[in-house]
Amino acid sequence: MLVLGIESSCDETGLALYDTQRGLLAHALHSQIAMHREYGGVVPELASRDHIRRALPLLEEVMAQSGTHRDDIDAIAFTQGPGLAGALLVGASIANALALAWNKPTVGIHHLEGHLLSPLLVDEPPPFPFIALLVSGGHTQLMRVTDVGVYETLGETLDDAAGEAFDKTAKLIGLGYPGGPEVSKLAETGTPGAVVLPRPMLHSGDLDFSFSGLKTAVLTQMKKFEAAKLESEALERAKADLARGFVDAAVDVLVAKSLAALKQTKLKRLVVAGGVGANRQLRAALSAAAAKRGFDVHYPDLALCTDNGAMIALAGALRLGRWPEQANADYAFTVKPRWDLASLAR
């Protein structure tokens, strides 16, 4: 089965072709970072308009890369939610318009299911069951994954997502957009232990997260720096130490909760997905813990940590392979800006 995947939930337009026999044939991605940078964050209306501009050229690109003709495609998968309503509508409209013109069925995909399954795109994919740590700008969750479509939420953030905390911390420190990669890069130059920040809910006894207090601690520390009237060079060193303190605290919590989930479920496989899954400090800490504790940890390729069409095409192929009745051939569709992954129907 050959599936075209279309991702447009936020500020990346992604298209890809996935074949159940040959694997990922082609994928193309356009990021809107440069467009949104001057606003310091994603502007939904601009995001929607840019998806309209980019989708068809990206389609031509993946078709040319793979030597695929439209007649070769068996189905079209699109991100149905969660995400920005306007952005989702663009992708859904394009998917269903193509499907109508080409006489193909469609299937709507949960954005987080795409992330959760993206590590299956590697050469040696992890077998089910496993624990999934989903960490992105909008979500932080621990899931027990028994099979495709069989997901149980074990813990989630009670306020800010981890990626949101990274972005907001970067803004407080005075770094550029997008903040996550910038604060991580600065943290690598900071001194370990120079600034120690709280580890929220580290000993809460459950698998939930909270990052708003950590963000507040960064704000408090920045106010102290301002009150001290540090010279320029000293201030930059202090900011680097603060960034290191923030990243260390966030990573400690993510690792500790992941280990607790593995212990609670007695599983030996951890899958890490979402944009924050590209963070080098997090990967290093989890890999070290895996070596020490005797479990396996799996990541998607770095290029597939961000939003992308490949994960949507894969999820579509897996769903249609198991449940052909989920194929939609009447081209009526809705989008779901809010959508709980645990409620996803098989």
Curated annotation (Swiss-Prot):
Query: By its UniProt entry, which Pfam families does this protein fall under?
Result: TsaD
What GO molecular function terms would the record report?
iron ion binding; N(6)-L-threonylcarbamoyladenine synthase activity
The catalytic activity, as recorded, is: L-threonylcarbamoyladenylate + adenosine(37) in tRNA = N(6)-L-threonylcarbamoyladenosine(37) in tRNA + AMP + H(+)
Q: Which UniProt keywords apply?
A: Acyltransferase, Cytoplasm, Iron, Metal-binding, Transferase, tRNA processing
* Main location (coarse class): cytoplasm
- SUPFAM superfamilies on file: Actin-like ATPase domain
| Protein known as | tRNA N6-adenosine threonylcarbamoyltransferase
Organism of provenance: Burkholderia ambifaria (strain MC40-6)
The gene is tsaD
